[in-house]
UniProtKB/Swiss-Prot annotation:
Subunit relationships: Part of the type III-B Cmr ribonucleoprotein (RNP) complex, an elongated RNP with Cmr2 and Cmr3 as the base, with Cmr4 and Cmr5 forming a helical core along the mature crRNA (39 or 45 nt in length), while the complex is capped by Cmr6 and Cmr1. The 5' end of the crRNA is bound to Cmr2 and Cmr3, while Cmr6 and a Cmr1 subunit (Cmr1-1 or Cmr1-2) cap the 3' end of the crRNA.
Claim: RNA-binding is one of the keywords in the record: yes
Biological function: CRISPR (clustered regularly interspaced short palindromic repeat), is an adaptive immune system that provides protection against mobile genetic elements (viruses, transposable elements and conjugative plasmids). CRISPR clusters contain sequences complementary to antecedent mobile elements and target invading nucleic acids. CRISPR clusters are transcribed and processed into CRISPR RNA (crRNA), formerly called psiRNA (prokaryotic silencing) in this organism.
GO cellular component: cytoplasm
Sorted UniProt keywords: Antiviral defense, Cytoplasm, Nucleotide-binding, RNA-binding
Name of this protein: CRISPR system Cmr subunit Cmr3
Amino acid sequence: MIEVTFTPYDVLLFRESRPFDAGSESVARSIIPLPQTVAGAIRTLLFYKGLKNCVGVGEEEPEFTLVGIAIGTEKGRIYPLPFNIIKSEKFYKVVNPGRFLGKLILPPKGKYKSGYVTESILEKYLKGELKEVEENKVIRIEKEKRIGIKLSREKKVVEEGMLYTVEFLRIEKIYAWIEDPGCGIKDILSSYEFLTLGGESRVAFVEVDDKTPDIFNRELGSTKKALFYFSTPTIGKVGEIVQELEKRLNAKIDDYLLVSSRPTAISGWDMHEKKPKGTKFAIPPGSVLFVEFKEEVEVPPYIKLGKLKKLGYGLALGGIWE
């Protein structure tokens, strides 16, 4: 596995999936980059280098595997706050499931408020050792608003009344983890100082390291009560995900509970067909799947679940809970 670090030159814009037209929709909002955005930048570079087999021309997925991505700050890699960490007065408290008539339930305590936590806090959470998080330890992504003016495509002049607001993200780092089947991705990326990301072609400087992050090498031991924290969007229905998990771990699940929010819409532009991709819906990052196995199972540090795994979707970090 190699780790690629992108350092954006300036603010970033990854537009949400809904249509935007200056004047009729006054705000162009940015979302946190999807894994396929990073995969697309790498596929474009490989295509430019003539490595069509590695790109997967005409295929939805490439030959290489983007294990997942994370964003970062000066504190290092950060991850979406798990959905079972609930805001109280001065702290964010971890709320684990209880039982009701043989079913796992989540007690209704407080409200979820989105944010990010450092890798060290997340690792403590995955070990089942985290009870609460101080409010000042929850990280927010800085947004910057700027004014845009629509230009006529034909005349290249300003169109009257077509002003709009653009909401950019100030992201310091984007990390990507790649499994390379022999495409020479490390050497190719190392020869470039920067790449462009997304349809807006925002510049980001590139660094490559072949050291696997510690979060992928954790030892959790065996347990009947495990959790799987989705750090990237996971495409698929929860029932399908549970069945896949049983098959991959060769273990029967007695009960499960997904703590999540509304699905994330995933779209994009098909460079081969030159048309928009169909919209898919995914379990959002930060979601947590609590499971009870019939027998003790060795919990993996991470596992890929759902569809389009090679595009970085479905990265689930293993953990335990009591």
